C-alpha cells in the first residue's frame, strides 16, 4: 500500500511538472545557462552514422544475409572443392549475425531507456546523454563488423590464390560498408580487396608502400604513441584499411619503431632532462666498453 502511494505521488508530481506553463521556459533557461552541446552532439551523431553506414540507420542491418546471398549467387559457395572454406565462411557469417543482433538489442534497450527518461524530463532531453554513447557503441560494433569482413576477405583471397578461375565477388551488401574515413564506396571496397583496383603492369616495380597506406599507418602510430605496435586484430583492421598484407603492416611498424618512434622518444627525453640524459648515456656506453 505504501509503495502504491509513493508511485501515485511520483506520477502526480510528474504530471504537474509536465503540465506546468513554466516548464518549457525553465527548460530553455537551463539550456542557455548549462549548454553541453546537445544540438552539436545530435548533429555529430547523425553525420557519423551516415558516414559509417550510408543508406542504413544501424550497422549490420541485414549485412550478413546480403553477403551470404552474394556469395551464393556468385557461385563461390557451391564449388565442390570448397567445403573447408564453406565452413569457415559460415562461422564468420554466423559471428557477423551475432554482432548485428547484439547491436540491434543494444539499440532497442537504449530506445527504451530514452523513452522512459523523456517521459519525465521532456522530449529530446536525453540526446545530450545518449548521443556520445551511441557514437562510441556504433564505432565499436562497426569495428567488429570490419574485422569480420576482413577475415572473410582473407579466406576468399587464400582460395583465389589456389584457384585462379574463381568468380570475382562484387557484393552490393558489402558496398554499403564504409571504413570510417568518408572515402567513396569504390575506394573502400578496393581497400577491402572485394573489388579489384587498376591493374599494375607486371614489369613496373613498386618503390615502397603507397603514400595513402603509409599515412594511415602513421596516423595510427601517433594515436597509439605509448603502445606503438598493433595487436593481431588491429593488424587485420589496418590491413583492410590500407590494402596491405598483414605482414607488410607488421614490418612497417617494426621499422617505424626503430626509425621514427625511438628517435622521437630520445629527443623528448633530451628536451626534458637535457645534459643529465647525455651524461647517463655516456656512462652506460663507457660501462659497456669496459
From Swiss-Prot:
Domain notes: The SR/KY and BELL domains are responsive for the interaction between the TALE/BELL proteins and the TALE/KNOX proteins.
Coarse class of the protein's main subcellular location: nucleus
Pfam families: Homeobox_KN, POX
Organism per entry: Arabidopsis thaliana (Mouse-ear cress)
Segments of the chain annotated as binding DNA: 202-264
Recorded family membership: Belongs to the TALE/BELL homeobox family.
A GO CC annotation given for this chain: nucleus
Stretches the record annotates as SR/KY domain: 20-36
Start and end residues of each stretch annotated as BELL domain: 81-152
Gene Ontology molecular function: any one: DNA binding
Name assigned to this protein: BEL1-like homeodomain protein 11
Alphabetized UniProt keyword annotations: DNA-binding, Homeobox, Nucleus, Transcription, Transcription regulation
Localization per Swiss-Prot or TrEMBL: Nucleus
Quaternary assembly: May form heterodimeric complexes with TALE/KNOX proteins.
InterPro entries cross-referenced by the UniProt entry: HD, Homeodomain-like_sf, KN_HD, POX_dom, TALE_homeobox
PROSITE patterns hit by this protein: HOMEOBOX_1, HOMEOBOX_2
Amino acid at each position: 500500500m505504501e509503495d502504491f502511494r509513493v508511485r501515485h505521488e511520483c506520477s502526480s508530481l510528474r504530471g504537474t511538472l509536465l503540465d506546468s506553463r513554466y516548464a518549457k521556459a525553465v527548460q530553455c533557461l537551463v539550456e542557455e545557462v548549462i549548454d553541453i552541446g546537445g544540438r552539436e552532439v545530435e548533429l555529430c551523431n547523425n553525420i557519423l552514422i551516415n558516414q559509417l553506414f550510408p543508406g542504413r540507420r544501424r550497422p549490420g542491418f541485414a549485412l550478413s544475409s546480403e553477403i551470404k546471398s552474394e556469395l551464393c549467387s556468385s557461385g563461390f559457395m557451391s564449388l565442390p572443392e570448397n567445403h573447408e572454406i564453406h565452413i569457415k565462411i559460415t562461422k564468420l557469417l554466423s559471428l557477423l549475425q551475432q554482432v548485428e543482433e547484439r547491436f540491434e538489442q543494444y539499440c532497442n534497450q537504449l530506445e527504451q531507456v530514452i523513452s522512459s527518461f523523456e517521459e519525465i524530463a521532456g522530449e529530446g532531453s536525453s540526446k545530450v546523454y545518449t548521443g556520445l554513447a551511441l557514437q562510441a557503441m556504433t564505432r565499436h560494433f562497426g569495428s567488429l563488423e570490419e574485422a569480420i569482413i576482413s577475415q572473410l576477405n582473407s579466406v576468399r583471397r587464400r582460395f583465389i590464390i589456389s584457384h585462379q578461375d574463381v568468380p570475382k565477388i562484387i557484393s552490393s551488401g558489402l558496398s554499403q560498408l564504409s571504413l570510417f574515413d568518408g572515402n567513396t564506396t569504390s575506394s573502400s571496397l578496393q581497400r577491402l580487396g572485394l573489388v579489384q583496383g587498376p591493374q599494375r603492369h607486371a614489369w613496373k616495380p613498386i618503390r615502397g608502400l603507397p603514400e595513402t597506406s603509409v599515412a594511415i599507418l602513421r596516423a595510427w602510430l601517433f594515436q597509439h604513441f605509448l603502445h606503438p605496435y598493433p595487436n593481431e586484430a588491429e593488424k587485420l583492421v589496418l590491413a583492410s584499411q590500407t590494402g596491405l598484407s598483414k605482414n607488410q603492416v607488421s614490418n612497417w611498424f617494426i621499422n617505424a619503431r626503430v626509425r621514427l618512434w625511438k628517435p622521437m622518444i630520445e629527443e623528448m627525453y633530451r628536451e626534458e632532462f637535457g645534459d643529465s640524459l647525455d651524461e647517463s648515456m655516456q656512462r652506460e656506453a663507457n660501462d659497456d666498453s669496459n
